[in-house]
Amino acid sequence: VKAFSCDTSKPKAHQYSPPTADSTEFTAYNLYAKKYGSQYPEEVILFLAHKDSQSWVDSPGAYDNCTGTVATMEIAHLLANHNCKRSVWFLFCNEEHTPWTSIAAAQNARIKGTNLIAIFNLDSLGGKSKQSLDSGLKTNVTLYTEPEGEPFADLMTEVNEIYNIGLLQTKFMRQRPGDDDGSFINAGFPMAVMNVGSYPYADPNYHLETDRPEPVDIENVRLATQARLASGL
């Protein structure tokens, strides 16, 4: 992969631009953890998050995407000794470099005939506007692109209500595939969805050097992780 170049003529949060032809190439690895199911091991539930922060700006990436990475790790930790009927895989990829390594992961899954029955992308959990943060709102949006993804978005609403988790949970249908879930949709897995703190994304520190741990609403991240785990099982 290559780091994105920085185009300072663009708005600060969107200064990424294609790398130059002579820019340095790096080897980026997709990291997997796999827990095989006890009854239906051929059916795979996938949780994924991009593990890298922005390559064109010196951002710590606390919301984007340390929150999604930590949430995915926590789900793996909680399921380590749980008897899962279906297999649960965890994928950590790169999305702030080019090309996205989730593209390779999705294409490999299609080539190998992996029976992915649910795909959950965790990205920038809890990231929201300052107004929402100051108001104490615990927000989560589930994005889906194809009709096959809507039931998984609705499931987030159901578990939020059943278990009284306390999220302000909404859903939104995108017009085209995007982010790492979009890599899987483009590879023929239309059920893929993404969880994010707000949409349109409203964190004022988005893609900035100020995306630091201190402003992160960790309680919001915890609640979104709980709901994602509950809906995944």
Label for each model-derived stretch:
Residues K10, K130-L233:
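Active-site-adjacent substrate-binding region
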Residues V1-K35:
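A non-catalytic alpha/beta surface segment that caps or lines the substrate-entry region
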Residues Y32, L46-L48, W89-L91:
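Soluble periplasmic/extracytoplasmic beta-strand elements of cell-envelope proteins
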Residues S5-T8, Q39-Y40, K51-S55, N94-P99, ...:
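Solvent-exposed loop/turn segments at secondary-structure junctions
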Residues T27, Q54-P151, L155:
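Acidic/histidine-rich catalytic neighborhood of metal-dependent amide-processing enzymes
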Residues P41-I45, N83-W89, G113-A118, E161-L167, ...:
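Loop/turn elements at helix/coil->beta-strand transitions in domains of secreted/extracellular proteins
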